[in-house]
From Swiss-Prot:
Gene of this entry: atpB
Keywords, ordered alphabetically: ATP synthesis, Cell membrane, CF(0), Hydrogen ion transport, Ion transport, Membrane, Transmembrane, Transmembrane helix, Transport
Protein name per the record: ATP synthase subunit a
One family name in Pfam for this protein: ATP-synt_A
Record keyword Hydrolase present: no
HAMAP family: ATP_synth_a_bact
Length: 238
């Protein structure tokens, strides 16, 4: 299968992937639109859209409660909720449609099917976790943890790097593989007309499975974020 081309624009030394930029904006707008719509006209007895929103908030809060001290959980609940929604929506964007120009440029994909994006997202989480650890504990006390006991310092530093790398690669591998298989199913439908009914049924089953996997990956990413954050800010970890 040929590698899809994407439109690029260069601003000085930086090259921007316009498709990736566009789908990231779409992801943000979808999340903002859903939360804005679901939070309008809220009542004491939730129903419909309000129930869905409150369930998502409660679900993500449960992740935070497992890994963060009780007095810290509220401080990071919005962060974890935003990360979960963003990753869940971004994972699923590329499953439902495929947009390509006649010249072969891909105009639609899941942001998380791009390794550079996943590395950037993982770097954001990693930096945020360390910044919060320093803010809560103080710079000296925070650095001391990496040298306690001092023979383990190289292993402690290596662990931080592998956490960053695995967070990105795990997400990329699952979402990219899902889009590749979806593309192969579409090619099967285009190969012969009589393959179309089979490809259609297979695509429905695969899309449903991919949605499930995408949501699981959003859960895993959020849970690992909460785990790494808890190790850095919890008083019980001192």
């Amino acid at each position: 299968m040929e590698e899809a081309k994407v439109p690029m624009v260069e601003l000085g030394p930086i090259t921007f992937n316009l498709t990736l930029l566009a789908v990231c904006i779409v992801t943000i707008l979808l999340i903002f639109g859903f939360v804005f719509w679901a939070s309008r006209q809220m009542t004491l007895k939730p129903k419909g859209k309000q129930t869905a929103l409150e369930y998502l908030i409660s679900f993500v809060n449960g992740i935070g409660e497992e890994h963060l001290d009780s007095h810290l959980q509220k401080s990071y609940s919005l962060l974890l909720f935003t990360i979960f929604l963003f990753v869940a929506v971004a994972n699923n964007l590329g499953l439902f449609t495929k947009l390509e120009t006649t010249s072969g440029y891909n105009l639609w994909t899941s942001p998380t099917a791009n390794l550079a994006f996943d590395l950037a997202l993982s770097l954001f989480v990693t930096l945020l976790v360390h910044i919060e650890g320093i803010r809560r504990r103080g710079f000296g006390a925070y650095l001391k943890r990496f040298a306690t006991p001092w023979p383990m310092t190289p292993m402690n530093l290596l662990e931080e790097f592998t956490n960053f790398l695995s967070l990105a690669i795990r997400l990329f591998g699952n979402i990219f593989a899902g889009e590749v298989v979806t593309g192969l199913i579409v090619q099967l439908a285009n190969y012969r007309l009589y393959w179309w009914p089979i490809a259609f049924l297979v695509n429905i089953a695969w899309t449903a499975f991919s949605i499930f996997i995408s949501c699981i990956q959003a859960f895993v990413f959020t849970k690992l974020t909460a785990t790494y954050l808890g190790k850095k800010v919890n008083e019980s970890e001192e």
